[in-house]
């Protein structure tokens, strides 16, 4: 059986990174990313994302949730 390993761009501010961060901080699923670094560049929201970007965000969110590693707020 052939399996294709999908690799995502994990740069800070990218779709995968933002999905991962949202899940880590227990924020709701809300696809977005930043054109450059998080919070210091233009934000791209769901309506303006490509299918591949949404897939990357979703993968980051899912992977982080599956890891079981979340921010401890205590």
PLM region spans:
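Intrinsic-disorder/low-complexity detector
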Residues: 1-74
């Amino acid at each position: 059986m052939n399996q294709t390993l999908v690799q995502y761009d994990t740069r800070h501010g990218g779709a995968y990174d933002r999905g991962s961060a949202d899940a880590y901080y227990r924020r709701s699923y809300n696809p977005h990313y930043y054109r450059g670094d998080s919070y210091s560049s233009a934000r791209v929201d769901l309506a303006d994302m490509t299918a591949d970007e949404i897939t990357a965000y979703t993968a980051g969110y899912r992977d982080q949730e599956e890891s079981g590693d979340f921010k401890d707020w205590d």
